[in-house]
Structures are given as C-alpha cells and as structure tokens.
Design a protein with these regions (language model features):
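Non-catalytic helical/linker scaffolds that mediate oligomerization, partner binding
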Residues: 1-479
Length: 479
C-alpha cells in the first residue's frame, strides 16, 4: 500500500450518497483522507450499493490504497406511515390517537405507525417523540393492542415516514428486521469489511448477528451502534462481544437527555479504549457544511474534542452523502485532527495493565513492551506482522506516538484495519526468515518515505516467522 508520509492517526469515515458516488468523486475523497466509506442501508438500492463497493475496490487497486467499507444496517427504526397531504399540523394540548400497524394515511387526529408493537411497549405517562424530538406526545392510555391515546405536548408539522422514539419505554422490536437480515446477506456476499448493527441494546443482539455471519462462513466484524438507554445501560456487555462501537449521537440525543450525550460519549470512548476496541463518534460533526464551504467554530471544536476523548474514528453522514462540499469537509476534518494530534501530548502513550490471567498474556506483554520501547528510544515507527489482526488492535490500544505499520499476508485484513487508530497496513507474504522480513520492512518504509536513514524503528512479531504464532519478539532496528 502506498501511504501518505504524514497522516492523521484518528480515522475518517464518510457516508456515500449522490454527492459522492462516482469514481471521480470517491477518488477525490480518498485523496483528501477518507479511510472508510459507509454504505447507509436506510437508503439506496442494492444496485447503488454494489456500484459503490466495486468502485471503491477499483480505486484501491488504481491508487494502491486500502480504504475500507462499512455496511450500516437500518435496524428496527419505528416510523410513521404516509401522511395526508404530505403533512398535517398538530398543536400543543390536542388529544389524538396513535394507531399501530395500520396502512391508512395519518391525519391530524389519527397518526399511524407501521410498528405493530408500539401499543404494547408504552404505558401512561411515557414520552413519544417524532422527527428527532421536534414533536412530543405524552401517553394517556393504551389498549395494549393497536391504539394509544396521546396528548400533544409540543406540536408542529407531521411529515410522512418520520422516525418515532420511545425514550421511556422498553422497545420489544427485534434487534434485526427481515430487511436487515436480507441486507446483511447482501453485504456478506460482497465482502464488506464491517457491518454496523443499529439500536444495539444488549450483548445477545451482537451474538445474533455474529451467528448469522459465522453461519455464512464469513468473518465480517461487527460495530454496535449505541443509540438507546438500554444500549447505554448494557454498554459493558456490548463492548465485550462487539468488535467496535459507534456513538450514534443522533438517536441517542433523542432517546436520552441531550445534555447527557457529551458525557455518555466520553464514557463509551474511555471503556472502548481500555478494552482495545475501536470506537467511532458519529452524527452532525460538520452538519453546516452540507450547505456551507466552512464549518462552524462549534463543529471544529466537536471534532477536536472527539479526537481528544480518544475516538478511533470520526464519521460524516449527510455532509459527504448529499452535501455541496464533500471534499472540503474531509480537508477541514483532516486539518482539525492533525492540529489536535500535533499539539496534544496527552493523546499518546496510554498504558493499560496487562492481564496475567488472559490467554493472550504473552503477546499482550510483548506488544506493551514494544510501545514502551518506542517511547523510551524515540523510535519513529512500530511494525507488526499479523494474520488475524490482533497485533494491530493491541498496538493501537496503547496509542504510541510512533507510527504503526502492519504487514500481513491476509489481503482482507488490509481494509479491515483502515478503521483502527494510527494503523497503516501493507501486504507482505515473503515469509522466509525474521532477518529477511526486518530487512524487507526497512526497505518498504524507507522507499515510501515513512522512515529516513538512521531512524529507529521497533519490530514485533513471532519467531520462528514461518510458524505464524503469537507475538513473542521485540527488536530495535535502524533504518
């Protein structure tokens, strides 16, 4: 892989849409600094998504890059159905009905949702929020079957197919809908690198999707999206079984009090950092750049604070999917990330205790030692050999200031690691001896400009190299 000699360690995930879905536009975004492209399965046809998948892979080949693909499943999003006249006005104090599972058109006195379980899930006094909280209803009564009597607390224009949030209720909808399962099969068939499960509420939700993946004979990694109170309550068990976490601040900011979201973000990031699991911060990071060529000061600060919190990646949604300035968004985000990383020593050298009881104790100790050694010697790089990726995830966990370069004989891993903090990957399969591998790594990193003559770098790997065992070796080398 041909890498940029200077690069941001915090990765960028960009959503693809009409503003960015051609070979030329995707190529521009990759050159500006996108690490992973998100395919939003709430929108678009399979034909649209397959075109993007094929185009990104063609660009990776043409540009000698390893940009990854993240499939984002829609999840059990509760929505209204169609609305009379394209929109009806409801006013505060109105008493109306919310009807479940009906295909009839909503009116100002009778709103209809396609979700069958709503009347069973709510109880008197519960909040019901529509359109990201713009409209608030209070439950007066429910027949526990099809109809809910509600009072309008904050009214407004009700538009078709807007989302419904139930922040006070235990939602009984399954973690994956039939649509999600079919969409997942499509993603697995086309070998996406990551799949994001929306509205993850408990560990069993992750186990369910992982079983589908395993039964398909795939090893696709799962991102759990935290966007409900249940997800927050069960965060520890979710982190334990997920491969990565997304702080999905859009629905989360509706489901819990908006003022609680910043601290929830910090809490989730801290737990993911300690567990060595990648964490993505998403939603409205540079929202104003949908229509403006520059971000607001608040948006720049939001991106900077996500980096300072320890996010592995920051994500863009409408900004790159439908916005007028997708390339400028990436350029601005890269600039902010680099500014923070170049001026924040507290970002680096995060030392976590090694668990002596863990089956990975030896490898963990070696990789921790490699990061300590890099800090103490001022090494410019840490290199690792891995087939499954464990070495890369562990090295990133310690947030070394030295650049992390991973060499692997597993081509699929190259794009998977595009999401992981600080990691840049190279394909390498000339496994002859440890000495020859170190010499090859030195050659690759010097010819690509990542090391200069005389630079120290730290090698980690397993000896003998042909056994492809766990990491058991640390070596200081000179370029």
């Amino acid at each position: 892989m041909e890498n940029r000699p200077a690069f941001n360690k915090t990765k960028i995930v960009a959503t693809v849409g009409p503003a960015s879905n051609t070979y030329e536009r995707l190529g521009i975004l990759m050159r500006e600094g996108v690490d992973v492209f998100r395919l939003n399965f709430s929108h678009g046809s399979y034909e649209d998504h397959l075109s993007v998948i094929n185009t990104v892979r063609r660009l990776n080949k043409d540009m000698r890059t390893s940009v990854g693909l993240l499939q984002d499943l829609q999840g059990p999003k509760i929505r209204l159905g169609e609305v009379e006249g394209g929109g009806v006005e409801i006013k505060g104090g109105d008493r109306i009905k919310l009807v479940c599972g009906e295909q009839e058109i909503s009116t100002a006195t009778r709103l209809c949702t396609i979700y069958l379980g709503l009347a069973r899930d709510v109880k008197p006094g519960d909040q019901i929020l529509i359109d990201d909280g713009k409209i608030e209803l209070k439950v007066l009564a429910t027949d526990r079957d099809k109809e809910v009597d509600v009072e309008v607390v904050y009214g407004g224009l009700v538009k078709p197919r807007k989302g419904i949030n139930l922040p006070d209720s235990e939602v009984s909808a399954p973690s994956m809908t039939e649509k999600d399962i079919e969409d997942l099969k499509f993603g697995l068939e086309h070998d996406v690198d990551w799949v994001a499960l929306s509205f993850a509420r408990k560990a069993d939700d992750i186990r369910f999707i992982k079983k589908i993946i395993a039964d398909s004979g795939k090893k696709t990694r799962v991102v759990a999206k935290i966007e409900t109170p249940d997800g927050l309550r069960n965060i520890d068990e979710i982190i334990a079984v997920a491969d990565a976490i997304m702080v999905a601040r859009g629905d989360l900011g509706v489901e819990v009090k908006m003022e609680e979201v910043p601290m929830a973000q910090k809490m989730i990031i801290a737990k993911c950092n300690a567990a060595g699991k990648p964490v993505i911060v998403a939603t409205q990071m540079m929202e104003s750049m949908i229509t403006a060529p520059r971000p607001t000061r608040a948006e720049t600060s939001d991106v900077a604070n996500a980096v300072l919190d320890g996010a592995d990646a920051v994500m863009l949604s409408a900004e790159t999917a439908v916005g007028a300035y997708p390339a400028e968004v990436i350029r601005s985000m890269v600039g902010t990330i680099l500014s923070v990383e170049n001026n924040s020593p507290q970002l680096f050298h995060r030392w976590w205790p090694v668990n002596a009881a863990a089956p990975t104790f030896m490898a963990d100790s070696v990789l921790s030692a490699a990061c300590h050694l890099a800090k103490n010697t001022g090494a410019k790089a840490i290199t690792g050999m891995t087939h499954h990726g464990y070495t890369a995830f562990q090295l990133a966990k310690y947030r070394p200031k030295a650049n992390i370069f991973i060499f692997t004989d597993n081509r699929e891993l190259l794009t998977v690691l595009s999401l992981v903090w600080g990691v840049r990957s190279f394909y390498y399969d000339r496994l002859i001896s440890t000495d020859s591998t170190v010499a090859d790594i030195r050659y690759v990193l010097t010819t690509t400009g990542h090391l200069e003559t005389g630079d120290l770098f730290i090698n980690t790997g397993s000896m003998p190299i042909l056994d492809k065992g766990t990491a058991n070796m640390v070596k200081v080398s000179v370029a």
